[in-house]
């Protein structure tokens, strides 16, 4: 429920014309990591569509889970990226803000 509140709050009060940051919380099966391991870093970065950019990706290899931070002009770009892995990974996409943006929102 809290994640949906954050999404609604962000969509209502953030400047839509500005790029936003999204966190993709993912859990993948072993097949995904077999595919992932065959790719170069450039190939992985090239999966992000024009108008979006990977800021960071972190893996917990013991559980097959992790997060990706993506900056994007439109949420659809992040959804489209995540859908590319949907056969082998489950993902949850949540808009996130940094400390400065959080303080601006919370003090309105």
For the regions a language model picked out, list residue spans one by one.
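Short S/T/G/P-rich N-terminal loop/turn motif that feeds into the first structured element of a domain
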Residues: 4-65, 73-75, 98-108
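N-terminal cationic-hydrophobic initiation segments that often serve targeting/anchoring roles
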Residues: 49, 82-86
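Short amphipathic alpha-helices within nucleic acid-binding modules
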Residues: 73-83
């Amino acid at each position: 429920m809290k994640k949906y509140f954050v999404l609604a709050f962000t969509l209502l009060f953030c400047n839509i014309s500005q790029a936003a940051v999204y966190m993709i919380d993912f859990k993948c099966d072993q097949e995904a990591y077999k595919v992932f391991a065959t790719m170069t870093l450039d190939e992985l970065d090239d999966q992000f569509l024009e108008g979006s950019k990977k800021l960071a990706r972190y893996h917990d290899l013991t559980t097959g889970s992790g997060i990706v931070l993506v900056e994007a002009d439109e949420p659809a770009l992040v959804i489209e990226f995540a859908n590319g892995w949907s056969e082998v990974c489950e993902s949850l996409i949540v808009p996130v803000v940094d400390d400065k943006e959080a303080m601006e929102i919370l003090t309105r």
